[in-house]
Amino acid sequence: MQITEKYLPFGNWQTYCRIVGEATDRAPLLLLHGGPGSSHNYFEVLDQVAEKSGRQVIMYDQLGCGNSSIPDDQAETAYTAQTWVKELENVREQLGLDQIHLLGQSWGGMLALIYLCDYQPKGVKSLILSSTLASAKLWSQELHRLIKYLPKGEQAAIKEAETTGNYDSPAYQAANAHFMDQHAINVTPDLPEPVLRKKKGGNLAYLTGWGPNEYTPIGNLHGYEYTDRLKDLDLPALITSGTDDLCTPLVAKSMYDHLPNARWELFAGCGHMPFVQENAKYQELLSDWLISQD
């Protein structure tokens, strides 16, 4: 399968882009990774969707991580939703992506919703919301509910970190790691190489945009709230999430209930990455969805 790598100019920066497959008459699938700052790496497990669905699959590293520019010295102005939307617009313009299907995973889904609701772009044929959210407040509430299932000592370590603002203690680090093992993905050596691959940068983008962890959104996205605006998005939308996901069933259902033209697929036993944990099933679902929406 043909893999094309490009560096796209974006103002004084550049955006690394990875294109799977050759152009066809079907709209490409454009992937928006999570974080902020997680990089495209894990999306490489979806390369086969290009062949299965007969289209290009395009992924890129957002500003602040991976092979793209990492302007950490300009974090407060560079690592914002506005900049990341401009970068998305630039990727579409530079690659001539007039018609696309758009998939956003975690933060990438937030970026997709901001883009669609605030900028009303043309040419987005369908939306795939993968383990994402429409409300930072609900997300935080749900994750604090899940924290109550941790051992008492771990709950206390997390509470102390949030109270003091000190997230460096070994007790907190261990508690947060346990929480993420349960609800993001348990990192084991048998995971696919792209998922295990060490990403470049991204930590400051995450801290600036979101916060010190998943459940304490104190970055510049802390006020993110799009639930009531979903009713205005009439494009076909596919929501995917796991039963053990950071995107809890309530978070996913809140999006499903407000989107007028949505389907929701819940993956049993999966955390934040059903596309990794149930890769074959996810690829089949995604490929069938894309073909049905062409």
UniProtKB/Swiss-Prot annotation:
The superkingdom of the source organism is Bacteria
GO molecular function terms noted in the UniProt entry: aminopeptidase activity
Q: Which residues form a coiled coil?
A: none
Give the E.C. number(s).
3.4.11.5
Query: Which compartment or compartments is the protein found in?
Result: Cell envelope
Q: Which UniProt keywords apply?
A: Aminopeptidase, Hydrolase, Protease
Q: List the disulfide bonds.
A: none
Which biological process annotations from GO are given for this protein?
A: proteolysis
Q: Which SUPFAM superfamilies match?
A: alpha/beta-Hydrolases
Which residue range or ranges hold the AB hydrolase-1 domain?
28-278
* Catalysed conversion reaction: Release of N-terminal proline from a peptide
Q: Give the active-site positions.
A: S106 (nucleophile), D245, H272 (proton donor)
**Protein's UniProt keywords contain Protease:** yes
Q: Name one GO cellular component term.
A: membrane
Function in brief: Releases the N-terminal proline from various substrates. Cleaves Pro-betaNA (L-prolyl-beta-naphthylamide) effectively.
| Subunit composition and interactions | Homotrimer.
PANTHER family per UniProt:
HYDROLASE, PUTATIVE (AFU_ORTHOLOGUE AFUA_2G14860)-RELATED, MONOACYLGLYCEROL LIPASE
Q: Which family does it belong to?
A: Belongs to the peptidase S33 family.
Instruction: Quote the protein name from its UniProt record.
Output: Proline iminopeptidase
Organism (species): Lactobacillus delbrueckii subsp. lactis
Q: Which gene encodes it?
A: pip
